[in-house]
Amino acid sequence: MRFGDYRVEVISDCEFRLDGGAMFGVVPRNLWSQVSPPDDQNRILMNMNCLFIEAGEERILIDTGIGDKWAEKHRGMYAIDRRRSLDESLRAIAGIGADEVTIVINTHLHFDHAGGNTELDDAGKALPAFKNARYFVSRAEYEHAEAPSDRDRASYLPENWKPLKQSGQLELKEANYEVVPGLRMETHAGHNRSMQCPRLEQDGETLFGFADLVPTRAHVPFAWVMGYDLYPVETVEAKKKLLPQAAKENWTCLFYHDPDQPLGRIFEEDGKYHVARVS
């Protein structure tokens, strides 16, 4: 779709499943299961909705999904359902291949956001999947990924960024920065301290990617926060700041993990926030 002078597309990596209890934290199962029905292993269906932006000569991909480097054991654990590769999705939806992407941005380096940064060659070595792209990651996130805590260590897989460092394609950015005119990455703490969200502003319109602050439409209520969040109180505060603004200014919002409706608009009704479909 056109967004001001830019073209914007949602590029799905694949479907997968994570434990519903972990995804909804302290929210009781009898509540979250009404909006995100679990399977027989208590896992809920999710997607990875990467954002493609064509801005002049720049072809930008924000997040790269879970990737295709997984052993069969983990494919089963996460119920990874890949109907086509990220490169095939790019070609089908955006009309370009991976080699034509010029900038890759990771909101953070968790494996479900950075897994497609690299791919395996015939010898099983991880190499950059976007051979002609610069990769942007916040310096704080990179430093945390290099020395994670015991609580989130399993979310960081070095093969998703070390090959980028070795190839010279990785560029470390500060907390808030402009990618191209109108597109900024801004840090919002909660999920961790260094996750960044994209904000695209064109002709008075705003597109905002919530990354893992509001991973699905079901997470819009302030208190519906993931158990994965390192700083859940800060997630709530960020949502209290951003959601009213999104409703007031009629933002187009991207929900990275929503399996059915990646884009929506926030609206307030009777003191609660909801999501309307973007036509």
Which residues are covered by each model-predicted region?
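Hydrophobic/aromatic beta-strand patches that form the interior of the parallel beta-sheet core
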Residues: 9-11, 105, 136, 171-173, ...
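Conserved beta-strand hairpin/beta-sheet module of binuclear metal-dependent hydrolase folds
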Residues: 2-92, 197-213
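Metallo-beta-lactamase
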Residues: 81-96, 100-112, 122, 127-187, ...
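Cap/insert and terminal regions of metallo-dependent hydrolase folds
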Residues: 76-88, 201-279
